[in-house]
Amino acid sequence: VRWMQFGTFCPMMRSHGTELPREIWNFGKRGEWCFDAQEKMINLRYRLLPYIYSTSWDVSHNDGTFMRPLVMDFAADSKTHEVGGEFLFGRSLLVAPVTRPEVTEWSVYLPQGADWWDFWSNEKQQGGQTLNRCVSKEILPVYVKAGSILPFGPKVQYSAEKNWDNLEIRIYPGADGTFTLYEDENDNYNYEKGAYSTIRFHWDDKARRLTIEEREGSFPGMLKSRKFKVVLVGQNSGTGDRPMKGGKTISYAGKKKSIKL
């Protein structure tokens, strides 16, 4: 279970092993904690595909890094220089893998220079402190940097099962933020010839306004129109891997739009 949790936040998710069974049905059945805990992370990985795919493009396009030591983004915080058990998954998610058995608490350092939202509880924490996070076997400590814009896709069994015509866009308030949604044909190298599109999102925290810029680029099969369900994350919005409650739905056909939350 702990490995599956860690693997969920690796650039390429794999169920590693050689001679031992690795498929989740070898560890029980639905309704049993070991199966359910692994299925939870697999479903989360699929829902995070818009974030992961867009971040992969950013890494490739801008010569970036997917799994980032904290010091890369928070060099001014000297404590991050010594943190070796946490990493940033893209620029928004801080992950602290649990690497010892039978523990009930796990120490997590939140870098100074940002506030952080607990992904599972929506509890907001100030940066620059160490927390002892309760960690049941089903929970991996994950924190979202304030100002992050996270796109979530539908629950699927494989990556191309459903299109992204109704993405859930989560805003984690507390700072201004940007995110660029990247899309292409999914199954070839035509993006190297310019066959892709990007949509830039900007969050103005003081004005509580999300701006969706005009779409740039195109590719065969691109969605001409779609909907975004925009959710301002808080204590009553829902948490974790489940679809968020409330929010506002906005129709988008490639032209600039703005929504106040």
Regions flagged by a language model, labelled:
Residues 1-139, 144-145:
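Catalytic-domain carbohydrate-binding cleft regions of carbohydrate-active enzymes
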Residues 139-257:
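Accessory, solvent-exposed terminal regions and/or long lumenal/extracellular loops of proteins
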